[in-house]
């Protein structure tokens, strides 16, 4: 990285990875900002992240968001479409906030991962809920899932494109505003867990 002859690789040739800060200490190992081996211009590294147990923690966070957009049968496997959505969403985020969109995405993921959840403990036919802490990797997974689900539901039967909805969702989640689907869900999950401690 320090070698001046090397070209600095930016995401979509616009957004720099270098000035991205992580506000949450516990998630530092689980939110990869730059791909581990070498930086890429697009959020597509074609890595086999499901081979080992925690391998997917090394997957760049923007790529995990991209992969999570390819949900609901009709979008399966359409990564080009997902990459295009992410690209548009990042441009919209930059226009609205004047921040590095990668930073906004990281903040959104940190803010929308629930910290505790209620699990079902059943013994002899009596099922009760018990509050449990959530591991850092599961927090990241939940956050990504909630963010993309919120964007997808907002864009469905709506004039706004999914890129605009995703941008709104990420900006609101990064601010911690309750207009965001992910933040609302996170609060709900934590509220249920608190009631079942």
UniProtKB/Swiss-Prot annotation:
BP GO terms, sorted: translation
Query: Which Pfam family would be a valid example here?
Result: Ribosomal_S7
Q: Which UniProt keywords apply?
A: Ribonucleoprotein, Ribosomal protein
Q: Sorted alphabetically, which PROSITE patterns does this protein's record hold? A: RIBOSOMAL_S7
- GO cellular component terms listed in the entry, alphabetical order: small ribosomal subunit
One example GO MF annotation: RNA binding
Can you tell me which family this protein belongs to?
Answer: Belongs to the universal ribosomal protein uS7 family.
What protein does this entry describe? Answer: Small ribosomal subunit protein uS7
Q: Which organism is it from?
A: Cicer arietinum (Chickpea)
């Amino acid at each position: 990285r320090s070698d001046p002859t090397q070209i600095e690789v930016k995401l979509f040739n616009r957004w720099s990875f270098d000035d991205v800060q992580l506000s949450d200490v516990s998630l530092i190992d689980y939110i990869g900002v730059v791909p581990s081996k070498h930086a890429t211009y697009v959020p597509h590294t074609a890595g086999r992240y499901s081979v080992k147990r925690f391998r997917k923690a090394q997957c760049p966070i923007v790529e995990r968001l991209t992969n999570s957009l390819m949900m609901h049968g009709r979008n399966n496997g359409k990564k080009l479409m997902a990459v295009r959505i992410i690209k548009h969403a990042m441009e919209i985020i930059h226009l609205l906030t004047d921040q590095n969109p990668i930073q906004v995405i990281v903040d959104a993921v940190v803010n929308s991962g629930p910290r505790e959840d209620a699990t079902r403990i059943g013994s002899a036919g009596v099922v009760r809920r018990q509050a449990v802490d959530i591991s850092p990797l599961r927090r990241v997974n939940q956050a990504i899932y909630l963010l993309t689900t919120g964007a997808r539901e907002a864009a469905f039967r709506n004039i706004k494109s999914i890129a605009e909805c995703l941008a709104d969702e990420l900006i609101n989640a990064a601010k911690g505003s309750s207009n965001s689907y992910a933040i609302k869900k996170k609060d709900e999950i934590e509220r249920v867990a608190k009631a079942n401690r």
